[in-house]
Structures are given as C-alpha cells and as structure tokens.
Amino acid sequence: MATDSGEPASTEDSEKPDGVSFENRAARAVAPLTVEARIKEKYSTFSASGENIERKRFFRKSVEMTEDDKVAESSRRDERKAATNISRVDKVPTNVLRGGQEVKYEQCSKATSESSKDCFKEKTEKEMEEEAEMKAVATSPSGRFLKFDIELGRGAFKTVYKGLDTETWVEVAWCELQDRKLTKAEQQRFKEEAEMLKGLQHPNIVRFYDSWESTLKGKKCIVLVTELMTSGTLKTYLKRFKVMKPKVLRSWCRQILKGLQFLHTRTPPIIHRDLKCDNIFITGPTGSVKIGDLGLATLMRTSFAKSVIGTPEFMAPEMYEEHYDESVDVYAFGMCMLEMATSEYPYSECQNAAQIYRKVTSGIKPASFNKVTDPEVKEIIEGCIRQNKSERLSIKDLLNHAFFAEDTGLRVELAEEDDCSNSSLALRLWVEDPKKLKGKHKDNEAIEFSFNLEADTPEEVAYEMVKSGFFHESDSKAVAKSIRDRVTLIKKIREKKPAGCLEERRDSQCKYVRNVLPQQQTATLQPTPGPHTAAEYEETEVDQHVRQQFLQGKPQQQSSSVRGDTSSEPTAGPVLHSDTSSHPTVAYSSNQTTSSQEQPKLTQSPVLPVVQGQSSVMPIYAAGVGVVSQSQISPLTIQKVSQIKPVSQPIGAEQQATLQNPDFVRSLNQDVTSVKENTNNPDTPSGNGKQDRNKQRRASCPRPEKGTKFQLTVLQVSVSGDNMVECQLETHNNKMVTFKFDVDGDAPEDIADYMVEDNFVLENEKEKFVEELRAIVGQAQEILHVHSAVEKSIGVDSVALESNSNQTGSSEQVLINSASTQTSNESAPQSSPVGRWRFCINQTIKNREAQSPPSLQPSMAMVPGLHPFPSSRNTSNQAISQNTVFTIENNPGHRELFTSKLDHKDVVDGKIGEHASIETEQSSISYQVEDDRQIMTPATDNSNYSAALVCPVPGECEALTSQAGMFMPTYPNQQAAVLADVHIAYPGESVPIGGNAALTSVLVSSDQKPQSLSVQQPTIDAEFISKEGETTVNTETSSPKAVIATQTPGFEPAVILPATILESDGERPPKMEFADNRIKTLDEKLRNLLYQEHSISSICPESQKDTQSIDSPFSSSAEDILSYSMPEVIAISHCGIQDSPAQSPNFQQTGSKILSNVAASQPAHISVFKKDLNVITSVPSELCLHEMSPDASLPGDPEAYPAAVSSDGTIHLQTGGGYFGLSFTCPSLKNPISRKSWTRKLKSWAYRLRQSTSFFKRSKVRQVETEDKRSAIASDPIPLTREFSSDTRALSRCKAMSGSFQRGRFQVITVPQQQPVKMMSFGKDHRPPFNKTTVQSSEQALTFAEAAVSQLIEVEPAMPTHKASVSSRKLRTLYETFKEDKGDPEQGDIVSYSTACETSVSSVATEKNVTSTTEVSVQSGSEPLDKEKNESTPGKQTCTNEFSATLAGNRKSVTKTRPEGDQYLPLREEQAYAQTQNSLFYSPSSPMSSDNESEIEDEDLKVELQRLREKHIQEVVSLQTQQNKELQELYERLRATKDNKAQSSEVPLSPASPRRPRSFKSKLRSRPQSMTHSDNLVVKDALGVESNTVSCQQSPASKKGMFTDDLHKLVDDWTRETVGHFPSKPSLNQLKQSQQKSEAENWNKSCESTPSTMGYTSNWISSLSQIRGAAPTSLPQGLPLPSFHGPLASYGMPHVCQYNAVGAAGYPVQWVGISGPAQQSVVLPTQSGGLFQPGMNLQSFPAPPVQNPASIPPGPK
C-alpha cells in the first residue's frame, strides 16, 4: 500500500532485468528525494525531448545508459526546456556521446535545413508528454484521488504509483494489485476489511484511504490508496546504516508495538499477517515509524488461501496452518526486532522457503538470534518468536516491558505486598532521575501514599502531590503516568491471580515476616539483576528499584549468593521477587546454609521463623515452602518484607554467623547457597522474580513470566541417610506439588515424565524442569557432602552434646528420623496419588506456605528432624564448637530452619539462603554480643534459650538456656520468641528435632559447662544484642527478633519441640529423648495413645504439610498460622520475655518455660510483656513490623509498620487469615490419612490463624487499629495500624522510618533511613539492661510463668467464664507461689509468664487454631495483663516496667507509656481479639469455622487433639523434669489446684480454645461475637496452650515421678474420657461464673501475677487445653462448652477458655461481663472492665469446674 518510492516493494524489484523502462528506473533512483524534487525530476525525466531521446536511443540499440549519461541527458533536457530553439545539431553531439555513432551526427548535420521543423515537432512531443505526465492517468470512482503515471515501486503482486488527494492536496500512494481472481466471498471480505481499515487513524499506522476494483489493460485489479511514506522503509534504513543504535531500536520498536496494539485492540482485532521491515515505513522529518501494507496480506491470502503468500522468514509456524491469531504479529515483530538488532535478514542462512519452514515449524531460531548482544533485547526477541503461540508475549506485555517503557524518571512501587483483595494499595513513589523532572526533588526521598483502586485516579493523586509541594505542576502528568502504570500492572496481576491472590497474600505476609530476616542480606542480593522478566513483571521497575535500594541500604544482610538463588529458582524466581525472600534469602542462604549445616537445628529454626511469617502452621516445612510462596506471592510483600527485614535480619544473621564458626558457616552457606542459587536461579533468574521487589531488571518487570511457568523450590534435603530431597513445584495452573525423591535413586527424567503425565509440568517445560531438577540434585549432593563432612568434624562435639542432653541427642536423631519418617509418612499422606516421589498437591498453589510444611519437613533444615543436616546438626551443633552451638543457641530456631530450609529453600526459594544469611549474620552478631552479653547474663541467656530448646533435659535446658539466654536476653526475646514460636507452631512437630537438637546440644553444653556455654551464649547474645541493639532498641522487633521471630513462627515448633515440645507434644515424635525415661515412656504412650502415628505427629510439620497440601484450604490456613506464629514470636521476642526465662537461674525451669514460652512465646511473651511491660505492647507491634518487613525493627520503615501490624496482626491474620487458616487446617482434618496429619493441620491452623491473623491483622482497618495501639504502646517501633488501610500502613511505615515525615496523605521517607536504625539502637541500648534485669526475674518469671501457666491452663477452659477465672487465679497463685519462692515475683512473673505463654503457644501450635488464637490473645492480652499487672501490683508493675524498659529500650515508649500501653493494649488486644475471632470464623483452621468444627469433632481429630495435649503434657513433663524446685513447687501448687479443680482444669486443658486467647483480645476490643472473637480465640488458644504446657512442665518439675505417673494416668484417663465422650459445653454464664470463682480464689494469691497471668492466661489456657487434650482448640462456635465442675486439674486447661476462644464469635455473649478490652484477656472473660484489670485479672473470674480433660472433645480443637 504505502510504498517507499525509492525502494522496491519486494526482492523481485531488484531482480528485474536492465530492460526495465527508464521511467521506472529513474523514478526509483530518485526515491530518496522529496516529493517536490521527485516531481521535478519526473518532469525532466519524462520531458518530450527526453522521451525522444530515449526512443531514439532504444531504436538505435544504443548501449545502455550509464548513470552519468542519464544525468547528462537530464541536464541537456533542462537546457532544451530553457531554450526552446535549440538546434538539432546540439542534440546530435549528445546522441553521439550517448551512442558513439558518428553516422547519426552526420545525418543530423545534413538535415540542418529541416532543423526548424524537427525542433517544433520535438517541442510539441515534449510538451505533450509533459502534459500527459501532469495529467492524471486515472481517477478514483469517487473522483477524490488521482493517479499519476509515476511508478514509485513494484512488488510481486503490486505496483505503486504516485497519487494525489484532491481534497487535501496531499500526495498519496496508489497501489494496484494484480487480479487475484477473488471469489465473491473473498471480494466481500476484502470490502469489509477495507471499510474497516478506512476508519483506522493512528500515528503508527499508515493511513488507508480507499480501495476499489478496477480494470487495467483489460484485466481486473484492486486499487488501494494509502498514505505516502517519503523516507523509505525500515529495510532501506537498515541497508543504509547497517547498525541501529539501541536508543533508536527502542524508540522504533515501541512505535511498532503501539501500532500493533492499536490494531489488535480493535473490534474485531485486526491482524496484519505480513509484518516485516519492508512494510514498516519511516517518515524522515519526524522519525516516526508506521506500519503499512495493511490489507495486502488479506488480499494475498484470500486468493492464495492454500498457498502461503507472505514472507516465510517472518511467518509464525501456525501461519502455515491457517489457524492463527494476533500472536502471529508478535512473532513477526520479534523477527523484525531481530533484523533491526542484527541488520541481518532472519534465516538468511536458509536457501529456500522450505528450509525456513522446516526450521520455523521445528522451533529452531534464526542463526542471527545468537548474534544479538543485548541480553534484554535477546530476551524480548526470544519471548516473541517462541514456537508455541500461547507462550509468546503479548503486545501489552511487550509495551509494559521495562525495555520499552518510556522513562519518566519516576518509579512507583508497592510499599507493601498486595493481598489481591484490598482495594486500597500502599504505594511508594521514587524519583529516580530528578533531571527528567522540571521541578526540584530530592532523589533520596520516597513518597508513600495510599491509592484506592476504586475511588482514586492517578491524576487526582498526582494533583494532590503537586498541591502538597512534592512535584512541580509540569511533572504531574509524568507522576500520574507512573502511578497509572503501576496500578494497571497491579490490576493485571490481580486479574491473573484471582484464586492464588489470597494465598499469595498470605504468603506475602509470611514472606514478609520471613523476609524481614533475609532482607538485610537481600539488600545485597536484590541488587543483583535477574533474568526473570516474567517474575519481574509483577513488580515494576520502581518496586524492584526500591527494594534493591532498600536492601542495599542494609548491606549487613548482604547475601552474595542471593541473586544466584533467585535466578536459579523458577518458582522462587518470582520470589526474589519471587525470591524477595528468595533472592535476599539466597544471600541468606549462603550464611544460613552454613549455619544450618553446622547447626542444622538452630539454623533451621531461624529459617523457619522467617518462613513462619508465611505460614506458622508449617513452621519448618512451611518456612521452606512458605518462602517460595512468599517470594512468589508478592513482589510487594517481598519488597516490604525486605525493607523491614533488613534491619532485623542483619542482626539475626550476623549473630548466627558469629555463633557458628563464621568461616565455616560461610563456607557451608556458600555451598548451600550455590546449590540453592542454581536451583533457584531458574525460578528467580531476574533476581527480581515476580516478587522480588528489587528492581533487578526494569525491562522484565512489567512483563509476565516468559520463561518457565512452573516454579521449583527445594524444601528440604534429608541428611538422615536416605538422601531424600523434598521439592515443591508451583505448577503452571497454580497448584503446589510437593514431592520427594532420592538424590541417587530417582532420575530427574522419570520425575519429569510423571509430572508431565499428571499435568503438573507442561510438555514444553519438561526440559527446563529436568534441568532444574538436575541442578537441585547437584546442590543436594553438595549439601549432603558438606553435611557429612560437617557431621564428621562435629561428630565429637555432637556426641558430647547429645550425651549431655539425651533429649538433645535423641531429639536430633529423632528429628532426623522424623525427617525421614515425615518424608515417608507425611509424604505418603501428602503424596496423594503421585507415586514414588510422594507428590503433595496443593490446589491453592499460591499459598506456598501450605505446601511449605510438607516440603520443609523433608528438608530437615526446616524441621530439626527433617533438616538436611539434622543429625549432622546434632553432631554439628556439638562438634561445630560452642561457637556453632552458640549460634544455634542464639538462633536455635533460626539456624535450624536455615540449615535445612536453606538447603532446600535456598535452592527453592532463595529465601532460605536469605534466612541462612541472616542466621549467619545473627551468629556473628551473637558472637560479638556474646562477649558483652556474657558479662551481662551469660548463663541466663543461655538458660533462656536452652530451656526453650531443650527443656526436657534439665542440664541441657540449663545449658541451652544459658547459651540461649545469652543469645536471647539481648536477642533473647527474639530468640526465645523464635523458639517459642517454633514450639507453639508445632508442639510435637519436628521443631524440637532441628532447633531442639542444636539448642539441646547447646543446652547440654551450657548445663555441663554453664560458664563456657554462658560465655558463649552471652557472646552470641551480646553480639546479637549488639547488632540487635544497633538495629533497634526494640531488638525484639529488630533484626534479631525479626530474624528469630520472623523465622520462629514457622520454626517455632522446631525450636521448642526439641526438648520440651518434643516431649510434651505427643503429636510429633519427640525427636529428642526425654530427660527421664518415665517421661519418655509417657511420651511414647501419649504418642501411641493420642497419635498412633506419633512419629508422624512429631513430623507434624510435614504431616501438616501433607495434610495441608492435600487440603488446599488448610494449606492456606497453615500459611496463615505460620504468619500468625511469626508475629507472635516476634512480639514475644520483642517483649524479651524469653530473655527473662533465659536469664532465670533455674535453667531447667527456664528451659521448660522457655520451651513453653517458645511454644507460647509469641502470644505469651507478648502477653507477658504487655502485662509486665508496655514493651509487650510494643512487642506485638514490633512483631508486626518484623513480619511486615525489616522496618519492623525500624519504626520509620513503612514496611515495618505492616510487620508490626502483622505481629499484632497475628490476630489480624487470624481475622483475615481465618479463611486461610481454615484452609490450612482443613487439609489435615480433611485428610483422613492420619491423625497426626490432622494434628499437623491443627497446628497449621494455629499457625495459619496466627499468620492469617497477622495477615488479616494487616487488613487495613484492623491492622491500623492494632498498629495504632501498638504504636501508642511501643511508640515508634510499633506501627500498629494495618487497619487504617494501606494509607495508614504506608504512613506508619514511613513514620517508622527515620527521616520520614508526612504531608497530607503522603509519607515522605528518606531512603537511607529505611533501615530500622532506631530499633537497632533501641534494642541494643535497652536489651542488655533488660537481659540483666530479667536474668533474675527471668527464673522467677519462668517458674512463675509455668506455675501460672499451669493454673492458667486449668483456668483457661473456664476462661470464657470459669476457665478464664480459674486460669487467672491459678496463674496468680502460681505467680505468688513463684514470687514467694523466687522473691522477685514481678520480673520472675514476667519471665515465667512469657515462658508459660511460650509453652502454651507450643501446645497451641499443636492446635493450630488454638495456637493462633492464643498467640494473638497473648499478644494483645499480654499487654493488658502487663498493664493490669502493673496497675494491680505496684511492686510487680515496677518490675514489669523495669522489665519492659530493660527489655526493650525500643519498647521504651511502651514501658514509659504504660497507661498508654494499657489503652492501646486494650485496643490492640481488642483488635487482635476481633481479628482472631474473625480468623477463627473464616479460616478453615479457625476454631469457629464450621468446617473445622466438623473435622475437629471427628474421632481422628479428637485423638489427634488428645495426642497434641499429651504431647504437650510430655513436653511439660520433660521441661518440668529439668526445671528446678520452683517449677516443682509450682507444679505441686498446680497439682493441688488440679486436685481441687481437677475436672474443671482438665476440661479447660482439653479445649484451651483459641477463643480464649481471643477472649483476651476480646477484652481489649470488647467485641462480643464478632470476628474479633475469632481473633481472640486464636490468641486465647495460644495462651491456653502455653498455660497447659507450663502446667504440665511445672508438675513434673515439682514431682518428677509423680508428675510422670500423673501424666501417664492423666493421659490414660484423658484419652479414655476424651475419646469416650465430649462433655457438654457449659453455658457462657456457667463458664464465666466458674472462671470468676476460680479467679476470685486465685486472685488474692496471685494478684501481682494476675497481670502477667492474665497476659498468659489465654496462651496458657490454650496450651493446657491442648494438653488436657480432648477439646480442640477451635471448637465449633455453636459447640457448647462443657460445664466444668470441681477444681481445675493441674493439666486441666480451662476448657471454657478454649471453647470460649473458639466460641467467642460463636457466642453472642462471648465474654460475659467483659468489655472490649476485658474480653481480650482470655483469663478475664468475665471481666467487663479494662483490658486486664489487676483486680479483675484471673481471680475475678471463677475457674470453671473442669469435668475432665477428656470430657472436652478434641475435635473442636
């Protein structure tokens, strides 16, 4: 159509013989000339004389004119024109010159006489010809267009002449097509297309004016009139200039794409079908590019329908089959771009079309493709010329690609992960290139703002920014465009992932938490650009850039291998983005891997916690998978996480590194990282992955994933001897498939065949899948090799540690076995139909966390037992050296997680790497801090940690407590929190295996040589503190905490389970041996009784995973729970309760408590801290921050706020995550595969509820509320508001970030200040004091906490009514007793509370729903308790204040603002409560969910619950056995109470409903039956669990023999009763009355302890509930609570509490008498007063008589 006048339309033109008419040649020769010049030339060329000359010349057969001759002739003609009377002689010489014939000259001279005649005749002819040329030779039917006899070009089927539009007097191209002999149908079709083409007007489309049929020389032809392009085609340009500059290529390609997009967006879409450089025209003056020859393809194809008419080189394979769509134009564009990039014709190596056809249809790319130098251009071309049209990029994708993006100098990114459901987005706008803006702007500032997808428009927001003075008015369009592009991309992503979004959201949160740790390392990691364009597409350049900058801002977290990880992992790829964790994690991975290898358990724990943010339910496994999921989930999330994460992470990682032999760890990490990078690289080539917020590759960001659609993540590498690798595959259709294979025995090809056969992998992705599998195998082999080497080197030490702590050693072995067992058993359940590789399919693939647990399991790293280096870890932990041990101790959970998780996760997600790095970093930090800490409270710290890790073995516990204490005090809160979280997450899971083994070893070490351990641990702790402190006073929130806390949720069970939880939780096979044989026997009995598949139970993480995988909802739930757990852990860590316990002189007690704490750590600690310290309030917030992002440690970081919200959001998670939580929990329940699977699911529920709570907590409103409360309490460190909305969240984050300020709706953040520096300094400054302060009180607190927990456990069932009161009273009584024994009840209470809470939490973890509830409750309730406690007892308050002050300078605000804390606490707790309730209601794991109820009611569920409770009991026994007389006394006290109220306490124990914790929250919130109740439930449950655990622990402590015997008896009776029947639920009033009575009785005894008790009540109660057994954590809302009569048994957990927690939402009068704040405290269900009124605490609620622990149905749990 539009044809370049000087360029042949096709190759045929150039092939024409010389005999072509002169006119044509001349016309072509002047092609480049302007139209005017051409016209003049035309005249001269076709002048009459010229024609004569030509005629004569041809007539005389003169030699062909040369170019010079032609020019001469032309000039002669001009002269002739000028002088009409030119003698004929003048012409003769010319002729002679031309022809070289003298004869002619002679003849001419002879005819001189006739010259005048000839001249006249010539003149006439010349004029006639000129006139003819000037005349139109043809006219259009309408008369508008004229045709001149000036040929501009000729093609195979067309000839182009010059034309004129008489309406505009603009020259046009008149194109005549040869008669195609069209059928009538084809003619009609062409007419229709021509009419359609007439209306097309676009700056990049050659204008089509008209067309009609005509007759030329007796033949029919079709005439097309189009715009005339004067500067030739792209082909001529390439020929002329050979090389095209990148800038020109980008600009012209963008214009071509815009033209194609215009065509493809018509209705119906217009397909060019013959796009090639010959049909792309250039307009010289403007440099614009236009697509031409529209319609020609149609005409050519219509007549040659069966013969290929087109350009084979540019024809897509499907064009040959006549079945094609718009993608053929994308293919042709790719070939055009290839030609432009190489100046070489595609397939020029082929001799004919047949060869091209063969290559095209076989998918062989042109030889010139390899000549493309620019990788980005090459990537784009590759995405365009794929053989499968469905895999090609779309025009929109290409235009959104960063390469074609028009650089405005601005970058807009998500300030926090997108949950795909909230209409309000938190965005951050960066100025990348101030030079491109007309106004002045600081390039180091980021403007954070909220954007409502429904209400806001980019223009309005840009205008507001201009009004606010951020931008010049002239830049508003650029700002609006940047915002619009980002919002459009977000919308697109949401549309593409409607189903996976929710899960993704959850994952994002989990990832967020997890990333808090990895992010620091991620900072380094993220900068690494990644090849994943697809992964990047989710995250805009800005996002990537921001993340990158943010991460870079936190170099301490550098993870050199992160990028590698990101790149190699396809699934994780999006996680660096895709791996945000992934990439950051990769760096982590290096450190982490080392740590994990050296100290598998501890390393694993840390990783898990990080992952936990993703899914508490699958603490260990979830971490791995969760990481992937998270990465994947949301670039936004990752970005946030990474942002928040960095501060905390460096500390954690550094500490870990320090703890371990840094060099050794580094080498291990590097190895693992390398492996992971390789594995992860495919997934995260771009480093940005989709979720990597870093702006790894702007070009790829916007583009959807071009590469493999699947994502393969390594979850675990089993080093137990079976060489099994557990991988997680996110399929193309959003399914999560977890499978295990033998590194040596299974061939990747076989696995790939199976995957393809089951449609898990597309046929075209098979090759890539095999490659990635091979890379994973190689990495796994490396890991195994390193592991074996490490094991050998550490063997002696490990043995020693194991000897020191039977539990430690056996635990590790158990863990390993567990890993193996889990791999096989859980795998089997999960494996579903997938055959030998045990695939676990999770339909809700987006929720990677759900799959994470299963996958994590195999990777022992996540779960101590599963950890690839579990045994090695055991050995490693011991052999590695105390440094290593310390590292483990410091980050028991973290390290453990890191190790196994790293192995797999790094590979898989790169997140593990991140975690690993963090862990390593933590180690280093710990080492440094260790020295300081050592001085401060070496033994205490060790003890703290130790206890948490290896409570079962007194020595071990002490040692570990000592070491851990060191680690924990400074970072102890975080560490403890992590441990607690781990424990809680999986009371009986393999958590104990990994974390415990390492911790146990450390503990043993500490116990044996308290000083050295103490020293080491203090060093670790000190370093940790140092780093943490540096990171933030709120170290809890800070990196260490973030690291531990974040990781802990997932890893929590691992850490706690190691000693205490292992024993107490029959659900999971205690990986570690119990301190005493009786306990072990009891444990076995419990396992057999409660969990026939006890080992599986122990392996609960995997089982949960399997179950979760099976049940997609559960997977989600697990994920949520994990998130929940994380926040809680963080909160606890922040609170520093763990520190206290660690410090407690009684290491055994501390250990038990710590384990308890670890289990209930987050909820309990939060509760305790909240009670004892305003810090607690701050803690949740910090937890949230961590979970949200590194900013958690840094108040200023906007992401930190989301994290804070998350931690507080634990509840929120439950609320929003209730849905997810249910999802996760349900899989277990639904999965009839095994009860332990159900238990795992329950735990997953709890975790997911926690996480979902966190997640939901982040829900704008609730989160904001929580954040505000926490902010008030914790001031800066706690940006509590998720509820406010993205705005608030973003603002909070911004506020948190130092150097940030708010202007209207916008928050300006100084980029460099994004790191949580404040938090660091805070944590550092105050943490040591806290550690010191809590050292003594820690013991007391732990002891008291246990006693209180036991009471609480008993009371908890009454929590709604009786449970709460009983728990409160018992707790108080315990506290008083403990106080009396200890002498420093206040601090001791705090510590013990946190310990108890932790223990409860671990129980809760077992009961997933309960756990989340409990944790939430504890978090929110803890503060109220803390306040209440302070208020009620001045002395206690003082201690509490001291504790909070020392605990967290970062929480200074909280401590200082105790009243504020009280206020906020109620609010936060209320929020948490509401959220928890919501979570319970909505989440599958939610105790309120009807699904849950049904499943809970199942016999299997009951048995499972019983197992969980028994396991908790065992754990308690183990811990208690190791605890000192104080615990024993407490136990006796509890036992007496139990005897007095055996039934009531037992009943409470069984159900320890999550609602109880929610009740806690409810008090704060005063929400009677809303989702809030659900939230409270979750919290309550966690608390309840803690109480239960503590109670059990205390009992054995007081009377080992008796306790064990009692436990056995209790287990038997409990099993009998529980299994036998479900007692009817007492009415709320009854429960309340009972609780009130109990509380009244206990109030006097433990008035001081009340605040803390209250804080822990929920958690403890939940724990007790679980221990008690029968009642499931999450009971159906409608399920009536059993009426409890009689005194609470020591094991009796306030069943009411549990049910209440569950029933909070269910019962309109959830907490009768409890007003919003009061409701929150599980213990104070009856309270109508403030959150936790000192007077009203537990005592105010009489403990409900507990009929029987057995009487409470476990099903609801």
Swiss-Prot record:
Described function: Serine/threonine-protein kinase component of the WNK3-SPAK/OSR1 kinase cascade, which plays an important role in the regulation of electrolyte homeostasis and regulatory volume increase in response to hyperosmotic stress. WNK3 mediates regulatory volume increase in response to hyperosmotic stress by acting as a molecular crowding sensor, which senses cell shrinkage and mediates formation of a membraneless compartment by undergoing liquid-liquid phase separation.
Stored PROSITE patterns: PROTEIN_KINASE_DOM, PROTEIN_KINASE_ST
EC numbers: 2.7.11.1
Skewed-composition ranges (Pro residues): 1742-1757
Subcellular location: Cytoplasm
GO annotations of cellular component type: adherens junction; bicellular tight junction; cytoplasm
Catalytic reactions on record: L-seryl-[protein] + ATP = O-phospho-L-seryl-[protein] + ADP + H(+); L-threonyl-[protein] + ATP = O-phospho-L-threonyl-[protein] + ADP + H(+)
Complex and partners: Interacts with WNK1 and WNK4.
Family of this protein: Belongs to the protein kinase superfamily. Ser/Thr protein kinase family. WNK subfamily.
Activity regulation (UniProt): Activated in response to hyperosmotic stress: cell shrinkage promotes formation of a membraneless compartment that concentrates WNK3 with its substrates, OXSR1/OSR1 and STK39/SPAK. Activation requires autophosphorylation of Ser-307 and, to a lower extent, Ser-303. Autophosphorylation and subsequent activation is inhibited by increases in intracellular ionic strength: Cl(-) potently inhibits WNK3 kinase activity via direct binding. Also inhibited by K(+) ions. Kinase activity is inhibited by WNK4.
Annotated catalytic residues: D293
Residue ranges, compositional bias (Low complexity): 1479-1491, 1624-1637
Chain residue ranges for the region called Disordered: 1-25, 66-85, 551-604, 674-705, 1404-1440, 1479-1498, 1536-1574, 1621-1650, 1734-1757
PTM-bearing positions, type Phosphothreonine: T540
GO biological process, one term: cellular hyperosmotic response
Polar residues composition-biased segments: 551-570, 578-604, 674-689, 1404-1422, 1641-1650
Domain Protein kinase: residue ranges: 146-404
Tissue-by-tissue expression: Expressed in pancreatic duct.
Binding site for ATP: T226, E227, L228, M229, K276
Organism: Mus musculus (Mouse)
Residues modified to Phosphoserine: S62, S303, S307, S1039, S1550, S1553, S1595
Protein name, UniProt field: Serine/threonine-protein kinase WNK3
Gene that this sequence comes from: Wnk3
Region annotation (Interaction with KLHL3) ranges: 536-546
GO terms, molecular function: ATP binding; molecular condensate scaffold activity; protein kinase activity; protein serine kinase activity; protein serine/threonine kinase activity; transmembrane transporter binding; transporter activator activity
CDD domains per the UniProt record, alphabetical: STKc_WNK3
Bias (Basic residues): 1555-1566
